[in-house]
């Protein structure tokens, strides 16, 4: 007889404390020891693996290194960099971007003065102080904004081809401000040695607590699946079968790299995809239907047309194309 482990029927949400930025989630009952096991892995993934947007570098006219002072500005460059690291963004754009600012004093330069030139992002903490520009001073600054996961130190944030005076910034991509968990005993029938895990998640507002734990759970599941599907006996393939697999893989890889312009689409659908910055079939199928409908001017008619085109290639929305090394 196989022992049936206790599993939570569902994840409970503490509605009394729930906000757009904070959530308390309760998982019970759990077998003894699983509260700490699940709490640790959820905390690590939430803090280190969720995607977000952050400033990755800056360039200030007349400044050539990160330890300089700026004429007419109260703060020096290191202090300005520290303040910019705290600016939080909400973005649906997957590409890096740059925004240029001209600051004329006297003024209090805050995060709200950072404006996307093409609507790529939204600043969440608009009142965040960055610098004080004195009367008569004019400062021109370029901000480089990128997408990533977790945290990336400045020394790894120096792409090739950057202009002289480019200053790399420690990028705090993670949208999670804080995660903590506690484990308590709970009763099932006459037994009191089961566990209840309480997980507190605080975000910066760019993602909801509910979505953050859902995404973290998916990341964990994707990794654990490799172990669940493990077979100690490897299948034996003939040379012809290996060649067939390689040919099929290469065919799919080329298909996913095919440009959207090569599809027989209406002008409206082409324009919708261009505005959404979807350039290839691979980028298209990696989106879910509801994600596409969230883009500006993207309606059900365009979605139906795209589905018909994808069906010609036996493709669908929401596909995982990571193994085809899409770039």
UniProtKB/Swiss-Prot annotation:
Keywords: DNA-directed RNA polymerase, Nucleotidyltransferase, Transcription, Transferase. InterPro entries: DNA-dir_RNA_pol_insert (IPR011262), DNA-dir_RNA_pol_RpoA/D/Rpb3 (IPR011263), DNA-dir_RpoA (IPR011773), RBP11-like (IPR036603), RNAP_asu_C (IPR011260), RNApol_insert_sf (IPR036643). One of its GO terms (cellular component) is cytoplasm. CDD domains: RNAP_alpha_NTD (cd06928). The keyword Metal-binding does not apply. It comes from the Bacteria. One of its GO terms (molecular function) is protein dimerization activity. It catalyses: RNA(n) + a ribonucleoside 5'-triphosphate = RNA(n+1) + diphosphate. SMART domains: RPOLD. Its EC number is 2.7.7.6. Disulfide bonds: none annotated. Residues 1-231 are annotated as: Alpha N-terminal domain (alpha-NTD). It is an enzyme of class 2 (transferase). One of its GO terms (biological process) is DNA-templated transcription. The keyword Nucleotidyltransferase applies. Belongs to the RNA polymerase alpha chain family. Homodimer. The RNAP catalytic core consists of 2 alpha, 1 beta, 1 beta' and 1 omega subunit. When a sigma factor is associated with the core the holoenzyme is formed, which can initiate transcription. DNA-dependent RNA polymerase catalyzes the transcription of DNA into RNA using the four ribonucleoside triphosphates as substrates. HAMAP family: RNApol_bact_RpoA (MF_00059). This is DNA-directed RNA polymerase subunit alpha. It comes from Pelodictyon phaeoclathratiforme (strain DSM 5477 / BU-1).
